[in-house]
Amino acid sequence: MALLQISEPGKSLAPHQRRIAVGIDLGTTNSLVAIVRDALPKVLPDAQGRELLPSVIRYLPNGRTQAGFEALESVVIDPKNTIVSVKRFMGRGLLDVEHIESAPYDFVDQPGMLKLRTVAGDKSPIEVSAEILARLRQLAEDSVSDEIVGAVITVPAYFDDAQRQATKDAAKLAGIEVLRLLNEPTAAAITYGLDNASEGVYAVYDLGGGTFDISILRMSRGVFEVLATGGDSALGGDDFDHRLYCWVIEQAKLPPLSIHDHRTLLQACKHAKEQLSHNPLARVHETLADGTVVNVGISQAQFFEITQNLVTKTLMTCKKALRDAGLKAEDVKGVVMVGGSTRMPNVQRAVAELFGTQPLNNLNPDQVVALGAAMQADLLAGNQSKDDEWLLLDVIPLSLGIETMGGLVEKSIPRNTPIPVARAQDFTTFKDGQTALAIQVVQGERELAQDCRSLGRFELRGIPAMAAGAARIRVTFQVDADGFLSVSATEQGSGVKASIDIKPSYGLTDAEITRMLQDGFASAKEDLLSRSLREEQVNAQRLLDAVQTALDSDRSLLNAEEQAAIDREMTTLQKILNEETNSAVVRKAVDQAVKATDDFAQKRMNASIQKALSGKNVTEI
């Protein structure tokens, strides 16, 4: 008699078998894939033992692609078809990309995103990133000889919704199931915190090839709570390379270079920058296509001087993050350094001076993010015991809200709110009989919608006609653990509902994010004055509309003199509303108009009561 094997529904026939999930650090310069083996995270090497995969893709005329080190060899000889630093283009349009004029590519600006023209056709940054992710997936599958159930992919903390969505789309193209998008500093904190059993407040300073992030976290018994985050999604090692390149051009008095010579010299500058991390002197020595020899020496001190403003920008962001967390630099127990660009001595020294402590360098800055992602992937795959689990509490970088009457912003979720989160607020209609409501979702720190970034618009239609202010419309914001936003609006009485998943065409630029926060502080007083004026203007318009409605229905209650007096007061109020910029003056005019219409309001009330009581006796009242 055959024995039947019985298992729980949904369970593997081998319950001891681990589900393989990987952590992927999709970097600007290099990418890595890691898994957890024997309870320890490990970066997977390729067949040659190399753990870093250069984030470079080359397109060939025959439809083939080269990736990693193979493609890197063609950066100089085939610059138009060899795509580097594609992460800087993710979720962005042409106007969003810095130093676009120095890039060697032929860009195609299409609605929704830019594309790069290659011999294999126009390629989007999503498609290029998908090629990199596909190579990492193949590397992982070859290493474990098993199916990969999913991946945790890391992104800069300051990636906006468009950039995060682009990353998920690239993973989908590469055949990878995304278990979660994890902020890079948070991934690094997981690695450091679990590796060192650390508790207390820590900063994660993440300076990669194309992005910068700073996160302030509190680590405590398996809980990783992000207190504040800041960053610049277009500042990284590439910018240091570009600054050195411009300096060499100036020193050598070179004319504008061809695409080929530009790539040649830029690669030489990158190599010199890396040498200066370990040597006091370096030399940029290259021969250009026309035979011109470029031979320029540079010292560490000179390099520090020409790149100091880039380092200072990162420090300013660190100070802002500390303020947002309500902390001082001395409250930070340690600073975890992440990203290859943190190897630069001037960066190490500047961070040490700001926080008053030597940065923590006991973990490889190139690997720490991928290792943390692997541990989170292993947890999400269900391989960790209850005792090994931990909790991540990440935050959103900028406030979210909607535009209300008068162009004001009502913030529903303040910046640095832990995610996932859902918040609801009730709003109402402005005019009598209003049956639709246009809702604009905005992101930023200013008081007026025009000064914030618009994320999307949608309309709620089918609101039952009723008096202004009678409808109750509940607007709900939801931000998931990956940082994706959805907004819904429901009219409470009828149940009419509308919603939107926010998918902006282009992402926020670093300048916009920095400006939003700085303007929020620098313009606080001005914003409050503007908000006060808008509020009084809304009150004035509401009164004008209400009086006009009353006159249309009950003008017969007034004699000619009373009508003329109210008309004069309304004309004066309308003139002040159109011309006045002082909220106190508008408020005074509204108060006067209210007084001028008090008798009319009383007459309408009396008439209404008289009408209601007409034909009834005392016993019916």
UniProtKB/Swiss-Prot annotation:
Entry annotated with the keyword Glycosyltransferase: no
Gene3D superfamilies listed in its UniProt record: 1.20.1270.10, 3.30.420.40, Actin, Chain A, domain 4, Substrate Binding Domain Of DNAk, Chain A, domain 1
UniProt keyword ATP-binding, yes or no: yes
One Pfam family, short name: HSP70
Keywords: ATP-binding, Chaperone, Nucleotide-binding
Similarity section: Belongs to the heat shock protein 70 family.
The protein's name in its UniProt record: Chaperone protein HscA homolog
Organism: Polynucleobacter necessarius subsp. necessarius (strain STIR1)
Lineage of producing organism: Bacteria, Pseudomonadati, Pseudomonadota, Betaproteobacteria, Burkholderiales
